[in-house]
């Protein structure tokens, strides 16, 4: 059974694939099955992925407020996916913000550039303080 961290990792990968223009209809189901994300964890993955996709404009507007000299469109694709997922969970889910931010930092360490964890921590921490 997949952990929530593994689910979030898969959701970041799906958000990345969507951003890169992949056809998502069958891909989401196939990818989650390949990663052995099933049952309750599958529902959690679907909720996160669909929630980010449905609310991406509001999420991006919120992120833009805290990116200082950047816009969300200027951020690397992997970092953007991690930020969107973290911001979605802070804005729309009743999960401890410290857990969400820590998960995002861990995802950045695994998937993104060397300076990304600190950057992602700073942005999500600022969002978490006002939400």
Swiss-Prot record:
InterPro entries: NusB-like_sf, NusB_fam, NusB_RsmB_TIM44. It comes from the Bacteria. GO terms for cellular component: cytosol. One of its GO terms (biological process) is transcription antitermination. The keyword Metal-binding does not apply. Keywords: RNA-binding, Transcription, Transcription antitermination, Transcription regulation. It holds the Pfam family NusB. GO terms for molecular function: RNA binding. SUPFAM superfamilies: NusB-like. The keyword Transcription applies. Belongs to the NusB family. PANTHER family: ANTITERMINATION NUSB DOMAIN-CONTAINING PROTEIN, N UTILIZATION SUBSTANCE PROTEIN B-RELATED. Involved in transcription antitermination. Required for transcription of ribosomal RNA (rRNA) genes. Binds specifically to the boxA antiterminator sequence of the ribosomal RNA (rrn) operons. This is Transcription antitermination protein NusB. It comes from Campylobacter hominis (strain ATCC BAA-381 / DSM 21671 / CCUG 45161 / LMG 19568 / NCTC 13146 / CH001A).
